Amino acid sequence: MPVWTDAAQCKSTMVLALNDWWCRMGGPSIVPDRSAVDPLELKALLPNILIAEVEHDPFRVRYRLQGTKVTEITGIDITGHYLDELLSVEPDQPWQEHYLTVYRSRRPLFGSTTVPRSAGGTVDYEFGIFPLRRGGDLVEQFIALEDYFGLLGTIEQIEPWRVRSR
């Protein structure tokens, strides 16, 4: 599925709103600090937001928070799980590489993907992944958003991700 770095290619008003916030908080060459995340300012976006933290060596992504809409649509709460522990229903979507790209570039990455629905058929959604600092200069966290374009959804509307067996 396609990914891009130019926010102008986004169709999602929610992804664009988070991009506007990110640019306003950081500026053209500065990654915003996690302390700038104000839930009241981002209230309309919160159900679709994910916050993840970075482990640097080796590079790993651990989800700290997942919005209620993401849980409702995906059928799984990935809070507390590492990305590499999860089995995506989108084998062609290299999520780990997307986060690594954002980590290295210190810039947002946008994209769209298609996932299977539990009842058959597919759902398209758009996403944005944005880097955050936490007091220093290193990228320590990510704030991401998934826009399901008005999909009402119930639990397991799309095929859920699964935690890998150990």
Spans of model-derived segments:
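Intrinsically disordered, low-complexity terminal regulatory regions
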Residues: 1-86, 93-166
